[in-house]
């Protein structure tokens, strides 16, 4: 039984999570500089460690209903191609789960495409949707986000 740590966050009223090993840092919300002619899911950029960090809005990317949240956070994600931030409504907790507890998403009826989903985790009365960060951006979208 392998235990992994996941970062649980909210988009709207739903719980989502990602492996904590893919997360570099959690930032408080800060003003995002908008970029002209950018894809709708790319909210813009922020200054992060003296470089430019693209900010991906998962609510827009997944086509979810936007809710006003005063707890918005930016999760800084490490990828081989570079770093980017994902804008979330709030961050809930870091939780230890067993890999065996991650269920196959095939039976899932959800508002977001299954291609983004790594699996489902039952947590008390809630279902946490595990996001596959490798599939958030297509190759073409990565080129736009990282090459500008």
Predicted regions mapped to residue ranges:
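An acidic, low-aromatic, low-complexity terminal/linker signal
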Residues: 1-148
